[in-house]
Amino acid sequence: MSNNSKIIQMCVAGQRKKGWSDEQFAHEFTVVHAEITKATAEKAPALLGYRQVLAIPRPRISAFNMNNSTWDSQAVLTWSSIEELSSLLKSEGYRANAGNHVFTEPDIVGSISQVAGEFVFDPVGYSSQESRFMVFVYIPRATRSSRELVTEQEVAQRLDNITKIGAGTGLLRYVINRDVTPSDPSQLFDGTPFTNGDWGVMGVTEQYWFKDEDTASAFFADEARVDALMKVPSSLDGKSCVAVAGQETVLVSK
């Protein structure tokens, strides 16, 4: 993927449609929706990447409020720009295909974000894994109505903290993303399944990659480590995190 300051990630956490079984939801998300999105990516050069995390069964992790989590899926779609994303969401082709495939409840958690910093603890271990276990975290702003971007200093503070916490552990890679959701997300998502999403309240999103679930569980089982993880910059609300964890599947990578 090219280094472009306009590249954004559309991140969405979803809950299965009411009454759906594990098997039905897993099929609709990891097979049907996956195939639709891959087909879209073939026709849309602006769709640069697509990653899925299926949180079924629930992982054995309690950090970041995951012990009470009701979230079944996490999708991360990488776009060349927010303008390109907006253009596709408004296209007839999208609305006739992906826009009609609804497999989650209307109330979703979402963020339009940009990578702000990262640290790879084990480059060889990360690159050699065909499949990894990922923990995706949404950290809301302390003031929900604020649209101020998290500062460079706060990003650096958080990155430095995680770099110290993750050293010598099973954590392979960490990425922090700054939320850049437009001030009026309804204009972007009007007429799409994302209209009722909880957009614009997040300050940052975070991604933690591990070799497997056992390694991730061991990492988050350390209470002192988790306490340190929950110490976030003052503009953020660490107590109200939303997190989704599961095996990551990379479906599109350009």
Curated annotation (Swiss-Prot):
Q: What is this protein called?
A: Chalcone isomerase cfoK
**Gene encoding this polypeptide?**
cfok
A biological process (GO) of this protein is:
flavonoid biosynthetic process
Q: Which UniProt keywords apply?
A: Flavonoid biosynthesis, Isomerase
Could you state a single Gene Ontology molecular function term?
A: isomerase activity
Q: Where is the active site?
A: 33, 50
Deleted gene: phenotype:
Impairs the formation of flavonones and leads to the accumulation of chalcone intermediates.
Q: What is the effect of changing residue 50 to A/F?
A: Completely abolishes the catalytic activity
Per its record, the protein catalyses: a chalcone = a flavanone
Q: What is its EC number?
A: 5.5.1.6
Q: Cite the SUPFAM superfamilies for this sequence.
A: Dimeric alpha+beta barrel (SSF54909)
Q: Which ranges of the sequence are coiled-coil?
A: none
Q: Describe the task this protein carries out.
A: Chalcone isomerase; part of the gene cluster that mediates the biosynthesis of chlorflavonin, a fungal flavonoid with acetolactate synthase inhibitory activity. Within the pathway, cfoK acts as chalcone isomerase (CHI), the key enzyme responsible for the tricyclic formation of flavanone through Michael-type intramolecular cyclization of chalcone. The hydrogen at C2'-OH is extracted by the imidazole ring of His-33, which induces the oxa-Michael addition to form the intermediate enolate through 6-endo-trig mode cyclization.
What taxonomic ancestry is recorded?
Eukaryota, Fungi, Dikarya, Ascomycota, Pezizomycotina
Does the record's keyword annotation contain Repressor? Answer: no
Record has DNA-binding as a keyword:
no
Instruction: Tell me where the signal peptide lies.
Output: none
EC primary class: isomerase
Which pathway?
Answer: Secondary metabolite biosynthesis; flavonoid biosynthesis
Superkingdom, natural source? Eukaryota
